[in-house]
């Protein structure tokens, strides 16, 4: 991220909550029918055998959900604590520690990629670069599925489940994100929004599906 201090605070914050995050959110996709449907559709559209990247994977719940349905998944996260938590829980997923702005992956390595509530931690100046980096690691015609909170506000946490943290959650406008995707060499194929589920924070959610062109 553009500001090194900001970058480090995100990493430290997720390191701090990694174990509790992994425990509290285990099995969360059983209560998110739209998320499951979109991920299943992505899996169907990914060339068989092509790996799928989970960018900002946390402890790997989403990556494991895909792996359990036959996908070869690679989870990438900035937080060493999250990567460690994922490796301890999900042997079916390959985990790598890495930055959205400099992904530890080869050009064109992945058939598809997902980034659920990942770009919300980026400095606004870095969003374009992150999208370009996602495009770099995708194969031609590869798909990128994004999820994020809708709006223009920034929510700051200095305490999370009783742990001291220092982290911002940046809400984003779908039209702005779609414009960044198109400028970076993607064609946006789907935009969708939903309200929060009962167990979630009370925010509106957006999903964008884009294809590398």
What are these regions, as identified by a protein language model?
Residues 1-47, 152:
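Conserved class I S-adenosyl-L-methionine
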Residues 51-55, 59-102:
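Class I SAM-dependent methyltransferase SAM/SAH-binding core
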Residues 101-113:
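A short acidic, Gly/Pro-enriched loop at the edge of an enzyme's catalytic core
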Residues 141-148:
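Conserved beta-strand signature within the Rossmann-like core of class I S-adenosyl-L-methionine
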Residues 169-184:
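Short alpha-helix
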Residues 197-213:
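Core SAM-dependent methyltransferase catalytic element
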């Amino acid at each position: 991220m553009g500001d090194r201090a900001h970058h480090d605070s995100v990493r430290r914050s997720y390191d701090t909550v990694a174990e509790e995050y992994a425990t509290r959110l285990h099995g969360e996709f059983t209560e998110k029918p739209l998320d499951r449907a979109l991920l299943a559709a992505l899996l169907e559209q990914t060339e068989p055998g092509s790996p799928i990247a989970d960018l900002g994977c946390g402890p790997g719940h989403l990556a494991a959900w895909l792996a359990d349905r036959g996908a070869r998944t690679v989870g990438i996260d900035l937080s060493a604590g999250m990567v460690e938590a994922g490796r301890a829980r999900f042997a079916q997923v390959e985990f790598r520690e890495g930055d959205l702005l400099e992904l530890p992956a080869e050009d064109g390595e992945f058939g598809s990629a997902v980034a659920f509530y990942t770009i919300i931690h980026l400095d606004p100046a870095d969003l374009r670069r992150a999208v370009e980096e996602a495009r770099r690691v995708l194969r031609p015609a590869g798909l990128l599925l994004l999820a994020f909170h809708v709006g223009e506000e920034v929510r700051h946490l200095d305490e999370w489940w009783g742990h001291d943290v220092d982290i911002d959650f940046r809400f984003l406008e779908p039209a702005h994100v779609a414009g960044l995707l198109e400028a970076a060499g993607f064609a946006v194929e789907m935009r969708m929004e939903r309200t929060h589920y009962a167990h979630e924070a009370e925010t509106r959610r957006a999903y964008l599906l884009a294809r590398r062109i």
